[in-house]
């Protein structure tokens, strides 16, 4: 009997680097809280150990400066620590980046729900996301911004 194939991506640990919660007005118990949510991701590779990397997810929800628009402001930053098996580093880097966000995102969702539920307000429950689609959109925006900056530099 063959051993199952080794997974190319290993999730080692995660830490919560930042939490900020501001309650502007107490919503009614049955009121649904609607917030504008911004999600940002970043991947940092270890120069000394190229098979190790950190995935950072930053989420802000609500308006910090305009409380009239938002009863709640929330900002969290969570770091996940990952490792790729060395034989597969070049082949799976993009795959690993997308999957590391997909692995880490439920922890961030749970953190946000817990913070708001423990604040004794209706919990904010982020929906599941299509990580591959989100990452593709982020890359498109980055490429557009890079092209725009290059164009502006030559004008």
Swiss-Prot record:
Positions of transmembrane segments: none
SUPFAM superfamilies: SecB-like
Biological process per Gene Ontology, one example term: protein transport
InterPro entries: SecB, SecB-like_sf
Highest taxon of the lineage: Archaea
Single Gene Ontology MF annotation: unfolded protein binding
Name of the protein described by the UniProt record: Uncharacterized protein MJ0357
Organism: Methanocaldococcus jannaschii (strain ATCC 43067 / DSM 2661 / JAL-1 / JCM 10045 / NBRC 100440) (Methanococcus jannaschii)
Organism placement in taxonomy: Archaea, Methanobacteriati, Methanobacteriota, Methanomada group, Methanococci
